Regions:
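Extended, low-polarity transmembrane helix blocks
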Residues: 1-60, 68-69, 76-85, 101-337
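Core segments of transmembrane alpha-helices
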Residues: 88-90
Length: 337
């Protein structure tokens, strides 16, 4: 009798989370649907390539930055990883919708959401959308692990038809049914507090959302200039965009080479920057710095060595610093070591 009551309770818990299961399942399955069925976004160097979106996560990712950096500097590995990642999202999302091996798939939801949170939780131009997707996915995955799926699921269908594997202990952990912990209160409380702690920590780390001053690294572009050197008729520097909106680039409309008094020794305007030869730009990542129609375009996460011709600067020893000017009016100046 007790087993029957427990079974009914677990079925009802799974029933109550049906809408959550369907919606979360679709959010992950739809990633596969968008990238491969509606459009093919897994082809490098084509518009909408998912690898470039992944590159946008790099500058301010938490804890997984070395992994992202390795992938975006190895395009072949990145493409394979994006394919595998998309297939995993499809399987996890579809199985969650169908209620098949629900608890195992909920671990997949938890893991995918955690990856989104750590990688892209800092993005969001008008609201904290990537962070919200991440923390809600983590919490939703945990809830579905606790409840399993109810009557409208393949797990329930297999149990109802007395399939042998549903009687195994592992099915309770990986499928659905009675939660295989005799007193789950401590487990639920501990898990919930850990997820709350993760939520508060990442909210503060990425956005200052718990105390102090709010900050949003997606509002305006930020460029880091380094490794400036000049030899004979060439000046080379490394530029790396670490902040700003991920949906469009920083548009450089001016570069000034200055002396120690701030006097302009050489100036490149937007037309000259739009005409920089591609061989003078050596990109490090899949998100590429490249000449645009009216400027030099620098996407979020892009890093490149840019070479300028300074043959027309006669007193090269006077070169002191480099200034980059964005179309928004923001300027960045870096001294030459």
């Amino acid at each position: 009798m007790k087993h029957t009551l427990n079974s009914q309770s677990s079925d009802m818990a799974g029933l109550y989370t049906l809408s959550l299961r369907m919606v979360i399942g679709w959010t992950y399955f739809s990633a596969f649907w968008r990238r491969l069925i509606l459009e093919n976004k897994l082809i490098p160097d084509e518009k909408g390539y998912i690898g470039e979106k992944f590159n946008h996560f790099l500058p301010n990712a938490l804890g997984i930055k070395p992994v992202i950096e390795y992938l975006v500097t190895h395009p072949d590995v990145l493409q394979r990883s994006m394919m595998i990642f998309t297939i995993i999202e499809a399987i996890v999302g579809l199985f969650i919708i169908l209620g098949l091996f629900t608890r195992l798939m909920s671990i997949g939801i938890f893991s995918l959401a955690l990856g989104i949170l750590l990688g892209s939780g800092w993005l969001g131009t008008t609201c904290l959308d990537e962070w919200q997707i991440g923390v809600l996915g983590v919490a939703g995955g945990f809830v579905m692990f606790l409840t399993g799926s109810g009557p409208y699921s393949l797990d329930h269908y297999f149990k109802k038809n007395n399939k042998k594997f549903t009687q195994k202990k592992w099915f309770q952990w990986l499928g659905s049914g009675n939660f295989p912990v005799s007193d789950p209160k401590g487990f639920v409380l501990a898990g919930s507090l850990i997820i709350l702690g993760l939520t508060l920590f990442t909210n503060q780390y990425f956005h200052g959302g718990v105390w102090g001053t709010l900050h949003n690294k997606s509002v305006k572009p930020k460029l880091e200039i380094s490794k400036i050197s000049h030899q004979h008729s060439k000046l080379t520097f490394e530029v790396y965009r670490t902040e700003g909106a991920d949906v469009y680039g920083s548009f450089l409309i001016g570069i000034h080479i200055l002396d120690k008094n701030g006097k302009i020794l050489k100036e490149l305007d937007h037309k000259e920057l739009a005409g920089i030869p591609k061989e003078d730009i050596q990109n490090h990542h899949v998100a590429k710095v490249k000449p645009g129609k009216h400027s030099l375009v620098i996407p979020l996460g892009a890093k490149a060595d840019v070479t300028l011709n300074i043959d027309d600067i006669f007193q090269k020893n006077d070169i002191h610093s480099l200034k980059l000017i964005d179309v928004s009016g923001i300027e960045w100046i870096e001294k030459i070591d």
